[in-house]
């Protein structure tokens, strides 16, 4: 009995179009699960922002990276894939409903022109809960990619839900993710959780461009001394362990929190993520 999984020699008349071929040859490539953009949309690079657990500031980092790239003259966009806990519209002060036609939506724009799409822009009330099962949530994220008109986007940042469940898997498989940014906090336990996020990126063959440690320190307004409120940093050790080239630290700053609450994240100025943005530009 023959083994259907045994690779044969490449046929002489091979067209290299594996989608039309039933041969199990050595050159056969698995079918891609990536989904196309709708006609007329353009997204040059997709960067996923992930975390192993919630509450570490992933949406903040996503927003700040989008703002940084927009300031550098690129067209930035944010796809809010955190369907059950969306916070991107609040950070940017965007509250109007998304507009569109029968089978598509336009991305909303922030004050500085960043394109965003989030489930909160589609709900009758922003406080309505999204009580959906995993496959439905993952399907909604895919539709944000395929059914939204993205206008000449240079860098799209995907704000992922925490963990390694349905949505992260869907994003890695359905979108052409060029790189990952991992967000963490100083607690030592989080180092183990970060390992899971990094290992998932490795499993999906997507490079980790950098790690951002949020709430890394507090700077005393009187003496200027930095205090590690939540413990000493482990970010360099984690980065070295996984061979990740870039690290960044965000401070505990009431002004940043106030800007997010007021929908004015675009007014926050700081060079904390400059080196990471350089790496993203070079990707």
Protein language model annotation of sequence segments:
Residues 117, 160, 173, 209, ...:
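Glycine-rich phosphate-binding loops of nucleotide-dependent enzymes
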Residues 75-77, 81-126, 131, 138:
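Phosphate-binding loop that captures ATP/GTP phosphates
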Residues 2-31, 198-283:
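C-terminal lobe/tail of nucleotide-utilizing enzymes
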């Amino acid at each position: 009995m023959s083994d259907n999984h045994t690779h044969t020699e490449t046929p002489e008349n091979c067209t290299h179009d594996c989608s039309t071929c039933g041969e199990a040859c050595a050159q056969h490539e698995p079918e891609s699960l990536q989904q196309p953009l709708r006609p007329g949309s353009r997204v040059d690079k997709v960067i996923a922002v992930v975390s192993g657990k919630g509450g570490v500031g992933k949406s903040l980092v996503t927003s700040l990276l989008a703002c940084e790239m927009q300031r550098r003259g690129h067209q930035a966009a944010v796809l809010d894939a955190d369907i059950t806990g969306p916070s991107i519209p609040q950070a940017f002060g965007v509250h109007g409903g998304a507009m569109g036609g029968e089978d598509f939506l336009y991305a909303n724009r922030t004050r500085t022109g960043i394109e965003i799409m989030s489930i909160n822009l589609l709900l009758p009330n922003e406080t309505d809960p999204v009580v959906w099962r995993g496959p439905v949530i993952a399907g909604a994220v895919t539709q944000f990619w395929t059914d939204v008109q993205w206008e000449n986007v240079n860098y799209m940042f995907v704000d992922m839900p925490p963990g390694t469940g349905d949505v992260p898997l869907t994003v890695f498989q359905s979108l052409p993710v060029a790189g990952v940014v991992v967000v963490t906090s100083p607690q030592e336990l989080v180092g183990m959780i970060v390992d899971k996020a990094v290992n998932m990126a490795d499993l999906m063959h997507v490079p980790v461009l950098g790690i951002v440690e949020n709430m890394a320190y507090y700077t005393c307004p009187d003496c200027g001394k930095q205090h590690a409120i939540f413990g000493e940093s482990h970010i360099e050790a984690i980065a070295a362990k996984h061979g990740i080239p870039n690290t960044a630290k965000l401070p505990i700053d009431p002004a940043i929190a106030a800007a997010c609450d007021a929908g004015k994240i675009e007014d926050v100025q700081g060079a904390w993520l400059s080196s990471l943005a350089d790496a993203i530009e070079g990707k």
